[in-house]
């Protein structure tokens, strides 16, 4: 197992939110091919099946949805921490 890239994790979260590679690509300002590639690399790096592919349709498995939710929460926590140190409140040293 390799630690996944943040770009791949963001692609997963966006895909989970929108349900399509096309909408995830629009949100991330990437091509559909780039998002699909990130999702494939994420599965490879984790050695974990999280996507079901039927023809051209791609859907998250139940475990994939659970992982995407965990990743979303982790990215929000990282973003919140970055905001807190960048814009500290008085007395919150």
Predicted regions and their residues:
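A short LG(V/I)-centered, amphipathic sequence patch enriched
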Residues: 43-60
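A short, exposed helix-loop element centered on a Lys and neighboring polar residues
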Residues: 79-83
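Short alpha-helical elements of helix-turn-helix
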Residues: 1-18, 36, 65-68, 72
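Helix-turn-helix DNA-binding elements, focusing on the entry/boundary residues of the two helices
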Residues: 20-21, 39, 53
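Short helix-boundary/capping micro-motifs
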Residues: 13-29
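Residues within the DNA-recognition helix of helix-turn-helix
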Residues: 31, 38-41
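Interdomain hinge and pocket-entrance segments immediately C-terminal to HTH DNA-binding domains
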Residues: 86-93
């Amino acid at each position: 197992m390799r630690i996944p890239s943040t770009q791949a994790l963001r692609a997963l979260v966006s895909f989970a939110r929108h349900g399509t590679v096309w909408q995830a690509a629009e949100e991330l300002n990437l091509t559909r091919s780039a998002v699909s590639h990130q999702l494939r690399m994420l599965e490879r790096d984790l050695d974990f099946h999280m996507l079901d592919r039927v023809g051209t349709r791609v859907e998250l498995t139940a475990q994939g949805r659970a992982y995407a939710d965990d990743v979303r929460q982790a990215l929000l926590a990282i973003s919140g921490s970055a905001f807190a140190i960048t814009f500290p409140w008085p007395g919150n040293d």
